[in-house]
């Protein structure tokens, strides 16, 4: 397996797809990277030369914030919003959706499993 930005990328996949295994590199950035380095998107990772791997590694690490650095930056941004008490920070603290989605129904991913609440007692 080839290593780029501290990630083992799969040998059998096309390079354009394999690059998306790096956190912070999606399809668009993978395409931009390949265009800038002049490497074909259809090449399999196993067919890359060492020089091409070095060129890819240098380009990605030089131009993009990826993996640990990006994760740290995102976590720091969230921590800062929580500390200053912004609306987004409060939503993060409460574990609710941050970007204005409805919460009366749905939002189960952020809220977690349902906690059942006792219903009304029947009047006699």
Swiss-Prot record:
Region span, Disordered: 94-124
PROSITE patterns xrefs: RIBOSOMAL_S13_1 (PS00646), RIBOSOMAL_S13_2 (PS50159)
Keyword RNA-binding appears in the UniProt entry: yes
Any one GO cellular component localisation term in the record: small ribosomal subunit
Family the UniProt entry places it in: Belongs to the universal ribosomal protein uS13 family.
PANTHER family found in the cross-reference section: 30S RIBOSOMAL PROTEIN S13/40S RIBOSOMAL PROTEIN S18, SMALL RIBOSOMAL SUBUNIT PROTEIN US13M
Stated name of the protein: Small ribosomal subunit protein uS13
The organism of origin for this protein: Pseudarthrobacter chlorophenolicus (strain ATCC 700700 / DSM 12829 / CIP 107037 / JCM 12360 / KCTC 9906 / NCIMB 13794 / A6) (Arthrobacter chlorophenolicus)
